[in-house]
């Protein structure tokens, strides 16, 4: 059979076409996200809200606004952001460990994964309703903010709750669509887009502070150096691996004899990625935000106290944030990596770690190595998230230059680029396979 001219080009073009479609879908989804962040909740005076957020600079409210992509400052329907979904995911994942029924469902494979996802959606709905009620009832009672809600009453409460819940559920659906039909993790990309959208105004505000003399030029230079240093360090660690040597003994399958081979099992230093930072932020933001909204009301003074203790830079905030990061590093790594399963797969394929017996001993060895790596990864994420926060608080620069936001931006970009490269390589691999098949037919 003769080789058809231009078929290789068409195969390569088809692979690039798939990549192009996925990229365009991600871009389109992010455009929708940005448009939605400008659609306001009816009945709120945006000018008064902007004044409120100006007073809340450097507090947990500004941090919440950063994660929502500025939607909170515009009283948008996306003001809750994707945080209720993340909180629900944390709760469901924890329950799959401690609840026998959910643990069994999780073991059912694809069908179990779909059920867990469905429960997460239900949890998101409940948390979104709870948080939206908190915001809707808390806004009219904010101290010194008369006129924030133009006409407080049942109509406003109902409209605000429906708008906020609908916005969160839409963002959850949009994130799932990006994961399925786009590139990368949809939820991480939405958070990334929210942070990046606020970077230009934050940079402009910082430069303006330096120009007016409110911020010393050397401090501005130090901030720039810190940002580049953190970015470099994140890239360096995220690409770091611990390679366990794996040997394949000489074996025979049918009539073919395979010679002994040596390779390695790569284990990332930070296997959990950016998830611990996002989960920890969600855990801190949820009670702190509710306390901030309700704290001004009569009889809720104890919530004001909690809100003050949970502000960025406070000892309790630092302790809880660091503890949450370390916990979620170990928890999420245990979810995505199973040493026993890895050891069993090595044993089935005839591979072994030199000096370690296959099976149980190999599983224990891999688990020990992974535990040490996870500890290093947890300390690294804690350092990245907290040290720049202290410096940011001392220099009075926006949250966008903090360690958490920089970590999320850098890691999401790296994961995105890695998936783009994977898609391109898979399209080239398919093209090579088709080419090999055509050569076989032509003989």
UniProtKB/Swiss-Prot annotation:
Changing residue 357 to H: In secY39; cold-sensitive. Residues 61-70, 71-76, 77-96 dip into the membrane without crossing it. Changing residue 290 to T: In secY121; altered signal sequence interaction. It is found in: Cell inner membrane. GO terms for biological process: intracellular protein transmembrane transport; intracellular protein transport; protein insertion into membrane from inner side; protein transport by the Sec complex; SRP-dependent cotranslational protein targeting to membrane, translocation. Keywords: Cell inner membrane, Cell membrane, Membrane, Protein transport, Translocation, Transmembrane, Transmembrane helix, Transport. GO terms for cellular component: cell envelope Sec protein transport complex; membrane; plasma membrane. SecY that is not part of the protein translocation apparatus is degraded by FtsH. Also degraded by FtsH when the SecYEG complex is jammed, or upon treatment with antibiotics that block translation elongation such as chloramphenicol. Belongs to the SecY/SEC61-alpha family. This is Protein translocase subunit SecY. It comes from Escherichia coli (strain K12). The gene is secY.
